Amino acid sequence: MSDNAQLSGLCDRFRGFYPVVIDVETAGFNAKTDALLEVAAITLKMDEQGWLMPDTTLHFHVEPFEGANLQPEALAFNGIDPSNPLRGAVSEYDALHAIFKMVRKGIKDSGCNRAIMVAHNATFDHSFMMAAAERASLKRNPFHPFVTFDTAALSGLALGQTVLSKACLAAGMEFDGTQAHSALYDTERTAVLFCEIVNRWKRLGGWPLPVPEEA
């Protein structure tokens, strides 16, 4: 086998996908009927040596859409009061329009083709983002409609943990339980965790992949 292929660009690392870390806080588990209340997004970048790191952050409190369910148990869990005017909440359209604009710029600047959502238990966050985009009639959704990177699964493989707080601690990161279930904090921790897993694989020699020598 020859030396590893020198693939250090973000567009090379994930076959043209542009990873964006997302976390949502909601008023329930049903993306079609329960309110999206908070969302944060962090884009990622690579340095010249191919190390992955967080880049740009956006964070919004979100107004419940008209007719949305607000499950008391969910509100008690995340501590959000949707009626609090100090939240400075914006519409689903405004929040996702801004996030999608940031993501599309990142895709273009990095030479990628499409965004891929990175999230902890990603099916949940992906379903709420897709449902909100549909309600807001946002046609230019940059995210893949079903492919995600789930840090719960990746953490189980790389660290032996699937809970976000435990995975962060296993990775040698700090995790403040008093800030958990804030979309901004959870997104920041998830972004650092994902970068650590990707970079750890690189440090261990798993990337770039070896390529066969020419005959």
Curated annotation (Swiss-Prot):
Q: Name one GO molecular function term.
A: 3'-5' exonuclease activity
What PANTHER family does the annotation carry?
DNA POLYMERASE III SUBUNIT EPSILON (PTHR30231), RIBONUCLEASE T (PTHR30231:SF2)
Quote the catalytic residue positions.
181
Q: Which GO terms describe its cellular component?
A: cytosol
* Stored HAMAP family: RNase_T (MF_00157)
Q: What is its EC number?
A: 3.1.13.-
Annotated function: Trims short 3' overhangs of a variety of RNA species, leaving a one or two nucleotide 3' overhang. Responsible for the end-turnover of tRNA: specifically removes the terminal AMP residue from uncharged tRNA (tRNA-C-C-A). Also appears to be involved in tRNA biosynthesis.
Q: From what organism does this protein derive?
A: Citrobacter koseri (strain ATCC BAA-895 / CDC 4225-83 / SGSC4696)
Q: Which residues form a coiled coil?
A: none
User: What cofactors does this protein use?
Assistant: Mg(2+)
The family database entries (Pfam families) matched by this protein are listed as:
RNase_T (PF00929)
Query: InterPro entries per the record?
Result: Exonuclease_RNaseT/DNA_pol3, RNase_T, RNaseH-like_sf, RNaseH_sf
Positions binding Mg(2+) 2 in this chain are 23, 25, 181, 186
Q: Give a GO biological-process term.
A: DNA replication proofreading
Q: Which key words tag this protein in UniProt?
A: Exonuclease, Hydrolase, Magnesium, Metal-binding, Nuclease, tRNA processing
Which EC class does it fall in?
hydrolase
Q: Where is this site: Important for substrate binding and specificity?
A: 29, 77, 124, 146
Protein family: Belongs to the RNase T family.
Q: Which residues bind Mg(2+) 1?
A: 23
Q: What is this protein called?
A: Ribonuclease T
Q: Which Gene3D superfamilies match?
A: Ribonuclease H-like superfamily/Ribonuclease H
Record text on cofactor binding: Binds two Mg(2+) per subunit. The active form of the enzyme binds two Mg(2+) ions in its active site. The first Mg(2+) forms only one salt bridge with the protein.
The Exonuclease domain sits at 20-194
